Amino acid sequence: MKRLFFMISAVLTTAFASAQTLTLEQCRQAAVENNKQVEQSRVEQEKSGHAVRLYKTNFLPKFNIVAADLYSFGKSDVKIPGGHLPIYSYNDAAGQFVPNVTMNADGTYTLNQYADFPSQKMKLKMDNIFLGGVMFEQPIYMGGKVTAAYNMSKIGEKIAGLNIKKTESEVIVATDEAYTMVVRAKEMVKVAEAYKAMLDELYKNVESAFRHGMRTRNDVLKVQVKQNEVELSIQKANNAVRLAKMNLCYYIGKPLEADIDVDASELNDESHEGVVADPLLILNRPEYEMLNQKMELAHEQVKLTRSDYLPNVALTGGYTYINGMKLDGKRLIDNGAASAMVTFKFPVFHFGEGSHKVRMAKAEQRLASLERDDLNNKMTLELTQAANNLNEAIAEVKMTAKSLEQAEENVRMSRKQFDVGYETLTEHLEAQSLWQKAYADDVEARCNLFLMKSRYLKAAGQLLF
């Protein structure tokens, strides 16, 4: 029998030894690295970074290569009428060439000498026409639109970064809760097993006394009923441990059936001091800064909306080459040229469209301000409640520790009095039950204190990864 016991003990020892023991910090880090919401927030930040670089390019000129090729079967005849061309001779007095004509009395001229110019008829064919070149566009003044859009993209990037911190703090709190569930469940197993050991020892004494005629069968049954209850408690506690570990595995990105354990010493910090809910602490929260950035975003949106109804000035230009068209079989166009153009647009009258759009943007800005004030009040309330809960949890730990100490002393005194017959079995069982409850309350209070501290740090903006 002893050999079988040692074999079972060895197997259990090996099993527990193979479990990976995780610290609270390791669980937090794994949860942040594997959480999908954190990953989404990081992708959003990456996207916002690309948006900043995208809108920055609007300050720079844009170059494009343009090309087009047209082939047309269209053609037409070009007729140039004939006539007389005057002949010029050099006039020494005038120092220039003058036409050889005679002025009539009615003011008309008669050509003294002329050359005949016969009429011309030529074929113009569209044939193949090619156009190609390099064009550029450079905004000079867009009413502040380019600057406003760029500023909005930078604000969006800041908000994305703050959202990562916010999501990480939420994940840390959720991980702390899952971690604490494992510690609580493990400690409850210890409570139940310690209570069982106490009952087992009592049962041996009562059963021995019954065999010697010093106790009744009813006394034995009373102890057995308590033993059955504690067996069920142990089973429930072990089930709670398994479920709590699976829940923790879910948060830290491990398979649900992974063999893990936690370091319970993280929750045994004896240095507990009360806190004061200073409203200025909410300034540390990423949510607070996000609200301020949203206000700035709404302010820039007003500028962006107004820019649609302000003057726009832009510079365009480039170099274009054209080759095409034939006149009597010879290429008519075959050259290139540089060009530049300044465009100016000034909205004049849109039936109040711009005014209404700007007012809508300003209304959104006021809504953002109201939202900020409302959420600031909510964060202050959350901080106050978290501080109260933490202070109450500190007081509760002190009380349960004292109650446990008193319950331990009470069960010792009860055992002595029971052994000498000054106390009934029912009274002694009640003392043991009070000790078990005090032990469980102390475990619950310590776990609750750890959670209240974690939630307070989040509410105060101090729980950052």
Region locations from a protein language model:
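Amphipathic alpha-helical coiled-coil segments
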Residues: 40-55, 167, 171-190, 201, ...
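Acidic, low-complexity, intrinsically disordered peripheral segments
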Residues: 64, 71-90, 441-465
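Small/polar, glycine/serine/threonine/aspartate-rich low-complexity segments that form flexible
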Residues: 66-135, 263-272, 317-346
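Periplasmic alpha-helical coiled-coil/stalk elements that build and connect Gram-negative outer-membrane
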Residues: 50, 162-282, 389, 393, ...
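Hydrophobic h-region of N-terminal signal peptides that target proteins for export
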Residues: 9-18
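Small/polar (Gly/Ser/Thr/Ala-rich) solvent-exposed segments
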Residues: 39, 62-77, 120-127, 137-166, ...
